[in-house]
């Protein structure tokens, strides 16, 4: 309805997590000429989403169907598979792992807007920037590198999926670096209950009640600790 009858030429996915890509197959049923851009590591899981659904179900449990509905496969012939480093028309593509091993970001040349997906963090209204860290691919070192990579574009604005566009690009990049260090260290040194309590407390300290509620709905704290726990477990052997 928001498109007001306009038909998109493509869906440019930053990554295939279900809150970003779960409805892609269903959307294509309405737009038969629309193509999908996706990183090569994510493409197989759009064609056959069974592992994607299973992974998300481990996080959301009995709420999976209520939250996300049916995840419809994407026909392979509708995909444009990316590796990073491409320039496609007005768009520059970079591989930006850290949040996900199949994450890419896009720079739109004419507008100088960078579409950074979850690499730019979660920022709602005047609230803080929090790194979204669900399992299984969190890699803090790669994430820091990806933040620097998209910051190096010199974009005028970052478009962050959760939620909005922001023109304080340098400050946002710095907030992400600080957030990755702070919350990564907390997850290393504490347990899930303490981590979740601190996330909620941070939101309440720095955001108004409406912003806090929006954040808790968009990025439930129970989804954040497991990704960092897995990261530290793998790193520490």
Label each region the model flagged.
Residues 1-11:
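Pre-active-site segment of Zn-dependent metallo-hydrolases
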Residues 186-237:
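C-terminal regulatory/interaction regions
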Residues 15, 36, 56, 96, ...:
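Divalent metal-coordination and catalytic microenvironments
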Residues 9-19, 46-95, 101-170:
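Metallo-beta-lactamase
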Residues 169-178:
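Histidine/acidic-residue-rich catalytic or RNA/ligand-binding cores of hydrolases
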């Amino acid at each position: 309805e928001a498109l007001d009858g306009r038909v998109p030429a493509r869906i440019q996915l930053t990554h295939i997590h279900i809150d970003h890509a779960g409805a892609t197959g269903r959307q294509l049923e309405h737009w038969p000429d629309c193509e999908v851009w996706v990183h090569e590591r994510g493409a197989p899981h759009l064609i056959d989403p069974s592992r994607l659904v299973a992974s998300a179900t481990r996080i959301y449990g009995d709420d999976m169907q209520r939250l996300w509905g049916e995840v419809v496969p994407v026909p392979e012939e509708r995909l444009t598979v990316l590796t990073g480093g491409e320039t496609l028309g007005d768009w520059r593509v970079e591989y930006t792992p850290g949040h996900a091993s199949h994450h890419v970001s896009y720079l739109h040349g004419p507008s100088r807007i960078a579409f950074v997906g979850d690499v730019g963090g979660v920022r709602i209204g005047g609230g803080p920037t929090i790194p979204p860290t669900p399992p299984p691919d969190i890699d803090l070192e790669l994430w820091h590198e990806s933040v620097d990579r998209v910051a190096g574009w010199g974009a005028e604005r970052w478009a962050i999926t959760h939620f909005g566009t922001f023109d304080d690009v340098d400050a946002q990049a710095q907030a992400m670096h600080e957030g990755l260090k702070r919350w990564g260290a907390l997850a290393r040194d504490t347990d899930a209950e303490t981590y979740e309590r601190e996330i909620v407390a941070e939101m309440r300290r720095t955001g108004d009640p409406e912003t806090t509620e929006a954040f808790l709905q968009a990025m439930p704290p129970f989804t954040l600790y497991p990704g960092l726990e897995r990261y530290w477990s793998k790193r520490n052997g």
